Amino acid sequence: MMKVLIVDDNASTREMVKIILQRTGHEVIGEAGDGDSAIKAFADLRPELVLLDIIMPGKSGIEVLSEIRGLDPAAKVIMLTAVDQDAVNSDLLSNGAAAIIYKPFSFDDFEKAFSKLK
């Protein structure tokens, strides 16, 4: 079981992710709807895993990933995105994302991404 922070500007997406995480035995310790809130929540809560959307108002998920890496280089971050572009994806992975889950997602997508954390 991991303590997880969910970051997505869409409340419905956050709720779906929360349900999947709870069904797989993980604990959602926080949620954020924008980049600045995400960084504050990460600093305050110190989750074991961050599920992070890329396209959000204000700071993008890419910027948030960089700031999280600055706070904790060992932080585990899985990106959530509808963007399936090789250049963006390789940039995310080279900047420390453990995996990428594409929207629309399924339960299996989370299991596959979580297996990359071990």
Regions from the PLM with identified roles:
Residues 45-51:
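Active-site beta3 strand of CheY-like receiver
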